[in-house]
Amino acid sequence: MQGGAAKKGVEIHGQYEAIEWVEPAAPKDERERAIIESDWQEAFIQKGGMTCWRERSYELFSGNTWETGQFDRVVFSGSGDARQAVIYDFKTNAKREGESVVAFENRLRKTYEGQMAMYVASLAKLTGIPQNRIEAKLLASATMSVIPVRTSTED
């Protein structure tokens, strides 16, 4: 990322990191209203016993490699053997001139599928949740869309 884009990314991460859950009946500001009116609500409206991690750093030793990373947002649901998780990663990439939403989403999927596969594997090691019960999704700020990412661990 270059200067301006990096600064924008840090600002956006900071804004969304501050939000644990959005109350649909009482949004606190325009940002929360935008979440409620978009697909992002799946990541920010708490249902049942959901819990979340926000900007959670981790370190682990995997094979012969020391791995460090940071999850933007992980939402957990269920318990025991039914526990599952969704990893959400904020992306501030801009749509290119003339690029359709579908092309933009496909570009982001392709660009970040390796990163998201690493996050899925890491979360499984850290939590004991099997990889087949962990989903990976991108939250694209340019379109306020949720972009599912297939990882190599999925069937």
Labelled PLM ranges:
Residues 1-80, 112-121, 125, 137-147:
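Nuclease catalytic cores
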Residues 55, 88-89:
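Residue-level detector of conserved, well-ordered beta-strand and adjacent loop positions
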Residues 84-86:
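Structural motif
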Residues 90-94, 140, 153:
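A short beta-strand motif that forms part of the nucleic acid-binding face
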Residues 90-108:
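Short beta-strand-loop-alpha-helix junction that forms the active-site gateway
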Residues 132-134:
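Short glycine-/polar-rich loops that comprise or flank the Walker A/P-loop
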Residues 145-155:
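Short, low-complexity, polybasic intrinsically disordered segments
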